[in-house]
Amino acid sequence: MKVRTNEEVSKALAEHKPVIALESTIISHGMPYPQNVETALKVEAIIREHGGVPATVGIIDGEAVVGMTPEEIEEFGKRGLSIPKVSRRDIPVIIANKSWGASTVATTMILAAKAGVEFFVTGGIGGVHRGAETTFDISADLEELGNTNVTVICAGAKAILDLPKTLEILETKGVPVLGFQTDELPAFYTRKSGLKVDHKLESYAEAAEIIHAKRDFGLDGGVLITNPIPEEYSMDTDAINAVIDSAIKEMDEKGIKGKECTPFLLAKIAEITGGKSLESNIQLVFNNAAVGTEIAKEYYK
């Protein structure tokens, strides 16, 4: 089964031009309509402004799509939470039932790789959830990063996670964790986590050379490029950690588990911060889109 690409994406791939994959969970689960559609189209516009071709990824009527039309993005936004989040395990069911599915980081990587897209920009990856030593709640995103040949540009793992354990799993999976002009892992809403990345990238060109080296040497798996949130949108570390702790406590009390955890926590954090965390989330995605496209341009030189 092939993935469907739109004309713009197909042409760019044929001409070895930078195509940037984008997930659709941020549209369906990340924020309400019409803000979700406006944000998705703005991210696409930023990629174009920097000389790349955006490819928003999802499953529509059972068809895997890499490069949605604006009309499809609009419909995705309107359907919102009624569209299920789809990770690797869910893809066969959604395709067989000819349903709609919102692509997580893992699914976006799978479909991007099938279409021949090397680069994928997102907000933050999933990882090891707090308390995973008893719940075993570990995102499938980490497994995908270990196996699938896509470079992911993000602002680190989502701050609601156990970041030290997430780094340990990435090390086990052989995933290089690179920091764009930082030697410290960004923590999504904040620029610093107190944890070191594997290597600090000084330039777009250096990032491109490292990706080429991994591909040319035949090492399967992803490359993770972490890019800190812009300073002006960074949140106070102590304040956001207190909010996250409060949100996790409420989630545990309500018995929320599995793939419902992340949407609940992000929405609760946005509620407690009066929307500031959502604004930070949007701005870091915009920033990642710009940086990711510049790296992709260097890669295809």
Residue ranges with predicted function:
Residues 24, 29-31, 37-92, 216-232:
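Glycine-rich nucleotide/cofactor/substrate-binding loop typically near the N-terminus or early
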Residues 20-22, 55-59, 101, 119-124, ...:
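General beta-strand structural signal in soluble alpha/beta enzymes
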Residues 2-13:
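N-terminal basic/disordered segments at the start of proteins
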Residues 219-287:
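A C-terminal functional module that forms or caps the active site or interfaces directly
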Residues 51, 71-121, 125:
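A generic, well-ordered mixed alpha/beta core segment in the N-terminal half of proteins
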Residues 104, 133-146, 150-171, 205-209:
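Active-site glycine-rich loop that binds ribose-phosphate moieties when present
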Residues 191-216:
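Anionic-ligand binding region
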Residues 11-14, 19-20, 111-114, 119-121, ...:
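Solvent-exposed alpha-helices and their adjacent loops that cap or buttress functional pockets
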